[in-house]
């Protein structure tokens, strides 16, 4: 997956997160929507982490394609 692909996925996920948050402001989300929001947030964390890995590998002369998405439990606990 190229950086542009990761960024495209990030943009799609961010748009969906925005839709869900807007809906949340207007009404209560269904259980399914709350689950989807949690999934979107997690997938965004994974994508941002993957993009950071790719950029770091490139900066230090390593193959960015060797970067792999980390486990959800790993990226969930990162401090921003």
Put a short name on every predicted segment.
Residues 1-80:
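Extended, charge-rich alpha-helical interface modules
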């Amino acid at each position: 997956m190229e950086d542009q692909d990761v960024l495209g996925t990030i943009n799609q996920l961010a748009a969906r997160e925005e839709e869900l948050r807007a809906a949340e402001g207007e009404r209560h989300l269904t259980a399914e929507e709350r689950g989807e929001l949690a999934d979107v947030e997690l997938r965004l964390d994974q994508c941002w982490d993957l993009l950071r890995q790719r950029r770091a590998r490139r900066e230090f002369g390593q193959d960015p394609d060797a970067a792999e998405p980390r486990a959800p439990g790993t990226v969930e606990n990162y401090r921003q």
